[in-house]
């Protein structure tokens, strides 16, 4: 009888541990940072340096993919996390001011995200670059050639509207350059604000 009682308690303990493991795994799988995401982001950028005589104004629209967390830089007992994810984007910029009309590019960057314990709000920082093509014009102070490289950085805030949808807002800076392939090489430096919608893919 004592053996039967011990066996019963053992089986109950195993069942409770298994339920706890399932619950923990399910909770982690629900974290937004552990899923592939797609987002559409747009904004308005103004020239911030005098490297060109043109007063550039750019509207950047991006299709962005973010990977699940690659690794955690830090994880607190409360559930807060500092994560690193991969960010890839197809960029379409329209020039509201300036001799060029558009810029098409691809970019890649790490996305560093500090998540609150409630898994609904995160601060993010991204820094990266890429390359693309614009419709250059033969005018002094313009970009001089179609091939242009880019470097960008962005910091902002995201908030989950639901388990599968989020809203983002940020401060965005980007630099365009042809790396000295033309002389002069005026480049473009613009700074502004962005907003975006994020959808979970899996």
Label every PLM stretch briefly.
Residues 34-40, 82-90, 104-106, 123-129, ...:
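Transmembrane beta-strands of outer-membrane beta-barrel proteins
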Residues 42-48, 67, 90-96, 112-114, ...:
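Transmembrane beta-strands of outer-membrane beta-barrel pores
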Residues 61-63, 188-202:
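Outer-membrane beta-barrel "beta-signal"
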Residues 1-33, 202:
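Cleavable N-terminal export/targeting peptides
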Residues 60-64, 107-109, 152-154, 194:
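Membrane-embedded beta-strand positions in outer-membrane beta-barrel channels/transporters
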């Amino acid at each position: 009888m004592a053996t039967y009682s011990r066996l019963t308690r053992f089986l109950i303990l195993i069942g409770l541990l298994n339920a706890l493991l399932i619950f923990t795994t399910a909770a982690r799988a629900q974290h937004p940072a552990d899923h592939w995401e797609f987002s559409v982001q747009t904004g308005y950028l103004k020239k911030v340096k005098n490297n060109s005589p043109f007063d550039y104004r750019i509207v950047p629209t991006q299709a962005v993919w973010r990977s699940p967390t690659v690794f955690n830089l830090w994880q607190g007992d409360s559930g807060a996390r500092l994560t690193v994810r991969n960010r890839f984007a197809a960029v379409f910029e329209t020039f509201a001011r300036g001799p060029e009309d558009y810029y098409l590019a691809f970019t890649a960057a790490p996305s560093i995200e500090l998540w609150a314990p409630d898994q609904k709000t995160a601060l993010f920082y991204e820094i990266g670059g890429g390359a693309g093509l614009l419709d250059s014009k033969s005018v002094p102070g313009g970009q001089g050639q179609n091939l242009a490289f880019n470097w960008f950085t962005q910091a902002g805030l995201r908030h989950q509207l639901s388990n599968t949808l989020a809203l983002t807002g940020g401060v965005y800076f980007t630099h365009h350059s042809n790396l000295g392939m033309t002389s002069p090489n005026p480049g473009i430096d613009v700074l502004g604000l962005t907003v975006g919608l994020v959808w979970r893919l899996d």
